[in-house]
Amino acid sequence: MKLRLLNMILSMMNKTNNNNNNNINNKKLLLKNMLLDMNNKRMNNMKTMLKNNNMNINNKLQHLNNMNNWNTQIYNYNKNMEIMNIMNDKLINKLLYKMMTLKLNNMNINKIIMSKTINQHSLNKLNIKFYYYYNNDINNMNNNNNNYYMNMMNKLMNIMNNNMNNSLCNILSYYYNKKVTIESIKLSYIYLNSDIFSKYISLNDMNKYNNGILTNYQRMLNNIMPKLNDHNISMNYINNINNINNNKYNNMINLLNNNNNNNNNNNNNNNNYIDNINNIYNNMTIDNIPMDILMYKYLVGWSIKFKGRLNNNNGRTSTTNLLNGTFNNKKYLWSNINNNYKLNYIPSNHNLYNNSNINKNGKYNIKVKLNFI
């Protein structure tokens, strides 16, 4: 692609500037500087990619999405304050869990499933973000109880985020000595967050799956999970990336044509021209594509691992694995062998969570793994 672009640039220069040696020399010098700058940027990108690949060697969580690695992002300006903030974050997490666990007739009913909080600390502000899912399937409750839960949820959200002095945000600001905001995000589907997904599975009655956990859980998951078509999703994803990169190259060629048709070849125009080329080149990488267009939108693979003693008749622990879709987002698996992009890869975004629970048969563990593209 780059050789073809270079040949097109040289051919256009030769056609438009055959009779003017000075302009040709200026164009060649400009082209040389532009290509050197592009080559330096490409080398820097290669070094970054090589460094990232070396970091993933002998790592079980290869290509793990960095967005899911942390629960607390803190500005480390004082060691004692850092420890106090971490302790406060854990207390706030427990407080929110208690608030989201509603009671009906003096019984705890996990109608609202909440994920772990994500705390983003800055010098003068704290943002607490968490996801929650309103579960309508547990205990087959009637409409009056559902209305009760929805009414309580509205009151909870008002307590957290209103501007009154007794709101939870204002109360927490006294303990943190900074502004506190709470960002609650309601999920329409349980598979959008692995933490909520694993809790949803563990909240179901595990005892009724003693006589064939694999078949019963597959039947249950088929009703709530999307019908995956990872091949078409990945193909569309790759085609969108290729189309965007082709548009970048076409914009670069159009700039070259406009510059050749322009008779004013002063230094200011040349500098603006180089800046435009640099801006286009900086936006060519996959990492700079806006997330709202392509990234983290489609679930292409999920797996669930059960480990523990779930049956009274079995004295040994058993392990059951459920897998659907794919966890490998390599481009060359779906693209043509002669594709110019076959050596690149799309970083997979794995979302992992472990949840342990105890029933009357013993202790068991549920591990959920989701792959988004």
From Swiss-Prot:
Q: Enumerate the Gene Ontology biological process terms.
A: translation
- Compartments where found: Mitochondrion
Keywords on record? Mitochondrion, Ribonucleoprotein, Ribosomal protein
Gene Ontology MF term list: structural constituent of ribosome
Tell me one Pfam family matched here: VAR1
Instruction: Enumerate the InterPro entries for this protein.
Output: Ribosomal_uS3m_fun (IPR007980)
Gene Ontology CC, one term: mitochondrion
Biological role: Essential for mitochondrial protein synthesis and required for the maturation of small ribosomal subunits.
Family, according to the entry, reads as follows: Belongs to the universal ribosomal protein uS3 family.
Please state what the protein is called. Answer: Small ribosomal subunit protein uS3m
- Name its species: Saccharomyces paradoxus
What lineage is on file? Eukaryota, Fungi, Dikarya, Ascomycota, Saccharomycotina
Gene designation:
VAR1
